[in-house]
Amino acid sequence: MVKYSTDPANPTKSAKAMGRDLRVHFKNTRETAFALRKMPLNKAKRYLEDVLAHKQAIPFRRYCRGVGRTAQVKNRQPNGQGRWPAKSAKFVLDLLKNAESNAEVKGLDVDALYISHIQVNQAQKQRRRTYRAHGRINPYMSNPCHIELILSEKEEPVKKEAESHIARKA
């Protein structure tokens, strides 16, 4: 059985999905996942489809050195740095669709689902080599990642009872 880093608050009202050793850049995928945290499922899927169509950009916050600015990120991040990581968006979108299917099988309300947990971890690096001048060899590494996410149903807040007026002693 696969171990997740966290357990959902209500396991009967949540669905999980995980991808391991995915050949997609860790840094781009981390920024993509961070942009989707706590987002409703339908909104997240629409957002990733817009990223693939270059209508909205992913804001780059941590791994942002050398990342250019774009007006599409102005309202989501102060310095406006962002990109359109297509491969990362496609992998995360596929994982969201997988989790949605898992939720349908469990009988959950798909319209009420939101991303309660999404996490990207570094996987083992894959080593290749490139041949350089004068007989030297340099490493040619790829940085794959593991992605895990949990979709949960929004819980309706319990309504507070109307206070009954109790006469106080004076």
From Swiss-Prot:
Keyword Transcription annotated: no
One GO term of the biological process aspect: cytoplasmic translation
GO CC annotation, single: cytosolic large ribosomal subunit
Keyword annotations from UniProtKB, A to Z: Ribonucleoprotein, Ribosomal protein
GO MF term list: structural constituent of ribosome
PROSITE patterns xref list: RIBOSOMAL_L22
Originating organism: Hordeum vulgare
NCBIfam families: PRK04223.1, uL22_arch_euk
A Pfam family this chain is assigned to: Ribosomal_L22
SUPFAM superfamilies in UniProt: Ribosomal protein L22
Family classification: Belongs to the universal ribosomal protein uL22 family.
Keyword Ribosomal protein: yes
Record-given protein name: Large ribosomal subunit protein uL22z
Lineage, highest ranks first: Eukaryota, Viridiplantae, Streptophyta, Embryophyta, Tracheophyta
